[in-house]
A protein has these predicted regions:
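Alpha/beta-hydrolase fold nucleophile elbow
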Residues: 105-116
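Conserved alpha/beta-hydrolase
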Residues: 48-76
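N-terminal cap/lid segment of alpha/beta-hydrolase-fold proteins
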Residues: 1-27
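Catalytic active-site module of serine/aspartate enzymes centered on a nucleophile-bearing elbow/loop
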Residues: 271, 275-310
């Protein structure tokens, strides 16, 4: 596409070339949105939303996280971040993209949006790199009880020792994602929880860069990240003046059908974030950007960005 530029930059892991995308508006940009995608997907899935923002004068950037899309080192497994602590490499890669883009447009307001796993990464980003964005959108996020995180990590650790961190386990996969689908039985597919839109679910299943079984190592890093962003002592490192929008479907199992999203929102308010908003769409599931009513979601997101772009 004429307005799309693809490039790579070195990952914080020291071995992977991170694939990234820029979508440029027709004229001079009025602002920037950086997107952090979810697990088992990739940056180019966000092109329709990026083009929508381009039409409003925004530059959009996104990268494929380690082990996703085209950010897979030669000989490395897919859906694997790396050794223990590699969650931070993924967050640092997000910051590298932010610096690279910000240096090219230092005067422009810079926003960040994370979906699903990308929302947990973005919450980590807000703790480690406070004050580097004008606003943050947390889409498809959640907050699990400590007991669930501890139990999940114990099981994933045992299975990682059995099959290797870089390999997947169907036990972990079924516990993590199989439970999501139970709320929508009888199931048409294994991914009904993603979307009310059957067209979107089918497109996801047909996409060779989507889905698949994540490594036990990725699950361990994700669980560590989710535990880190829950701790009040860590939340206090955020810039409390940075506005944050929590936005999800109220039938999204990642967000506990809205309960986990509210818990995350409440934790930000308790930490002292002065401008936090919560929006839940009745009946929508995980991928609200890809539902049949996505035009309304796009408009709502733009309204929030525009309101905070002054």
């Amino acid at each position: 596409m004429e307005n799309r530029k693809e490039f790579t930059f070195p990952s914080a892991d020291g071995r992977t070339a991170i694939h990234a995308v820029e979508w440029h508006p027709a004229g001079e940009p009025a602002g920037i949105l950086q997107i952090a995608h979810g697990v088992a997907e990739y940056a180019l899935r966000y092109e329709p939303f990026a083009r929508f923002l381009n039409a409003h004068g925004f530059l959009v950037v996104a990268n494929d996280h380690l082990g996703h899309g085209e950010s897979v080192a030669e000989g490395a497994p897919r859906l694997y971040f790396g050794e223990k602590g590699s969650w931070q490499h993924v967050v640092d890669d997000m910051y590298t993209l932010r610096c690279r883009t910000g240096e090219a447009y230092p005067e422009l307001p810079y926003f960040i949006m994370g979906h699903s796993m990308g929302s947990f990464l973005t919450r980590t980003y807000l703790i480690h790199y406070p004050g580097t964005v004008k606003g943050a959108i947390l889409m498809g996020t959640g907050q699990n009880p400590d007991a669930m995180l501890v139990g999940g990590k114990a099981l994933a650790s045992v299975l990682a020792r059995k099959v290797g961190r870089e390999n997947a386990s169907d036990v972990v996969e079924k516990l993590a994602f199989g439970a999501y689908n139970k709320a929508f039985a009888p199931n048409r597919t294994g991914y009904d929880w993603l979307s009310v839109s059957e067209e979107n679910v089918d497109a996801y299943i047909a996409d060779p860069l989507c889905g698949g079984m994540a490594s036990t190592g990725l699950f361990l890093e994700l669980l560590d990240g989710m535990a880190f962003i829950k701790k009040p002592a860590n939340l206090r490192h955020m810039n409390m003046a940075t506005p944050v929008l929590f936005i999800s479907g109220d039938r999204d199992p990642v967000g506990g059908m809205g309960k986990g999203v509210r818990a995350a929102y409440d934790s930000f308010r308790r930490a002292g974030v002065r401008d936090a908003e919560l929006k839940l769409y009745p009946g929508l599931r995980h991928e609200i950007l890809n539902e049949d009513c996505r035009a309304q979601v796009y408009d709502d997101l733009w309204e929030w960005i525009e309101r905070h772009n002054g």
